[in-house]
Amino acid sequence: MKTTINQVYKHVGEEVTIGAWIANKRSSGKIAFLQLRDGTGFIQGVVVKAEVDEETFQTAKSVTQETSLYVKGVVKEDERSPLGYELAVTSLEVIHEATDYPITPKEHGTEFLMDHRHLWLRSKRQHATMKIRNEIIRATYEFFNKEGFVKVDPPILTGSAPEGTTELFATKYFDEDAYLSQSGQLYMEAAAMALGKVFSFGPTFRAEKSKTKRHLIEFWMIEPEMAFVEFNENLEVQENYVSFIVQSVLENCKIELNTLGRDTSKLELIKAPFPRITYDEAIQFLKEKGFDDIEWGDDFGAPHETAIAESYDKPVFITHYPTSLKPFYMQPAPDREDVVLCADLIAPEGYGEIIGGSERIHDLELLEARLKEHGLESDAYQWYAELRKYGSVPHSGFGLGLERTVAWICGSPHVRETIPFPRLLNRLYP
């Protein structure tokens, strides 16, 4: 019976056939141990010389790393295995023998592994990270579908930008200038006026010349927009969403979290509501902590965000940033025009901002004034301003960076390990 590693629990005591690759192997006299992987998981195959023919045992001893083969064996329960099962191998059929596989079990440098990213993905830790990434995406669709959101796909090629054009990749669109999208937000606002509650999930591109462990040039964002939703309701959606995806990973990715050595006790604390502090309070807190490099009106750097996050065991919202620090579309606070109704959600354990969101300006006159202040008066934004001419309503939204969120939940040291093929400042291949 042909099956996959993640389904062996259904076949205890039965002989099954699995198409697999050799992840690793070792032998001890009359027993060979094969670490098998098939994409769905990892399992140990045990080959006992006395229980198989000579050809099978010699194959088990000589088979090379990443050789593909069909493995036939009896499924047995094994409490010592992370999977809970092992395979008592009865026969091996080699499909393709791999020779000189470059990523051997020894330690390798990061640049070497990145040069071989197409192969590094096969490793146990990278496999676990990709499975957790997939679970976050799956849970995202479940959450927003359950909450009545409609999935909308904004364009990747745009003629305007929500935050200006200084960090955009420009290209020619026939005789016009176009940009790779850094956010679908403006289009999602239009969609929210038609469909009420919408979300998008897709790639975004930022030409930031940054080499930090938090930055990618190409990354994926989840961007919801909601009509008739104001600032505090927006924060509630965010904390409920983040709580949901974390709990989904805890429930459905136990083996993967164990593979990564993740301390799940920290993730178990991630349940709404999340603490909230204002930008003013954050500045005061940092000064009390001895940060002399920060003044009101300055943006926070990674050390500042980490210091603030260390005071909490959950993500923390920093709200009401100065107007001067934020994009043109954010609604001013009703009692203070020098701050806006926005929030950044800072993840624990030094992973930084994972969400940025705000209530959006819904008054046409104010929006036009803000566009003028930011030097964005052009036909490219005419359609966006026009949304405020026909039944404008209060509305809010946010964007969650998938890779930073995956890094936090996995406990990964760098976002480059959270996307299959990372695009970095100095890396376009593979």
Curated annotation (Swiss-Prot):
GO terms for molecular function: asparagine-tRNA ligase activity; ATP binding; catalytic activity, acting on a protein; nucleic acid binding; transferase activity. It is found in: Cytoplasm. Transmembrane segments: none annotated. PROSITE patterns: AA_TRNA_LIGASE_II (PS50862). It catalyses: tRNA(Asn) + L-asparagine + ATP = L-asparaginyl-tRNA(Asn) + AMP + diphosphate + H(+). One of its GO terms (cellular component) is cytoplasm. Its EC number is 6.1.1.22. GO terms for biological process: asparaginyl-tRNA aminoacylation. NCBIfam families: asnS, PRK03932.1, PRK05159.1. This is Asparagine--tRNA ligase. It comes from Bacillus licheniformis (strain ATCC 14580 / DSM 13 / JCM 2505 / CCUG 7422 / NBRC 12200 / NCIMB 9375 / NCTC 10341 / NRRL NRS-1264 / Gibson 46). The gene is asnS.
